[in-house]
């Protein structure tokens, strides 16, 4: 940072951690990131030190909450959520793959929880995978090349979240779970709410019935 004042700097932590754990007061760090990782609910993989409650692996919104608890408050985003078409948990090629609706959920959950943006990833694009080359994640010979992956639905849907956020006053928007009247759901039934001065948005992944406190906006 001392030799380059013109570029933003951050730190990419390991899975299930936020950079604020180590660098909350670092002056060189312009914004925080966390890595919610690639595991599905209940996919703990061993008994090593685990920094999150069991069965919360997909709840990337909780990292936004925990990062905002550090002072001074800085912008934050999910630098590595689950990637489209990558095996759940990364390393078992026989696992199910993360789909477009999964990466969409991660994006909306994170942004509505208060992230300043989001990171999209794709198994093939991450590796710039070409025919004839081995893959790091998945089954060799069965993976699409990166230029075909550019047509995948998750890749082409991220623009809708960006356009939505930029269509509204960006700097007045705040996360506000008090909009959810009554009990909120868990896992895929979790509602995430955000608002500005005269609008509110709620992400409802499973289309569950919901009650909202509309007094939160003028």
For each predicted feature, which ranges?
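Substrate-binding/catalytic cleft of secreted carbohydrate-active enzymes
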Residues: 1-107
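Aromatic- and carboxylate-lined catalytic core of secreted/periplasmic carbohydrate-active enzymes
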Residues: 72-76, 84-86, 99, 103-218
């Amino acid at each position: 940072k001392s030799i380059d004042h013109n570029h933003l700097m951050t730190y990419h932590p390991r899975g299930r951690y936020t950079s604020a754990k180590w660098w909350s007061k670092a002056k060189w760090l312009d914004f925080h990131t966390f890595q919610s990782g690639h595991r599905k609910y209940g996919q703990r993989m061993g008994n090593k030190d685990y920094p999150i409650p069991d069965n919360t692996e997909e709840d990337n919104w909780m990292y936004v909450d925990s990062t905002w608890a550090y002072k001074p408050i800085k912008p934050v985003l999910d630098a590595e959520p689950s990637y489209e078409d990558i095996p759940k948990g990364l390393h078992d090629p026989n696992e199910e793959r993360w789909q477009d609706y999964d990466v969409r959920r991660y994006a909306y959950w994170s942004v509505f929880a208060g992230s300043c943006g989001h990171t999209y990833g794709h198994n093939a694009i991450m590796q710039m995978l070409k025919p004839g080359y081995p893959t790091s994640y998945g089954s060799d010979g069965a993976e699409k090349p990166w230029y075909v992956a550019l047509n995948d639905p998750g890749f082409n849907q991220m623009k809708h979240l960006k356009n939505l956020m930029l269509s509204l006053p960006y700097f007045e928007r705040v996360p506000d779970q008090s909009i959810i009247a009554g009990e909120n759901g868990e896992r895929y039934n979790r509602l995430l709410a955000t608002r500005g001065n005269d609008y509110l948005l709620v992400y409802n992944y499973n289309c569950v019935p919901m009650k909202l406190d509309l007094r939160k906006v003028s």
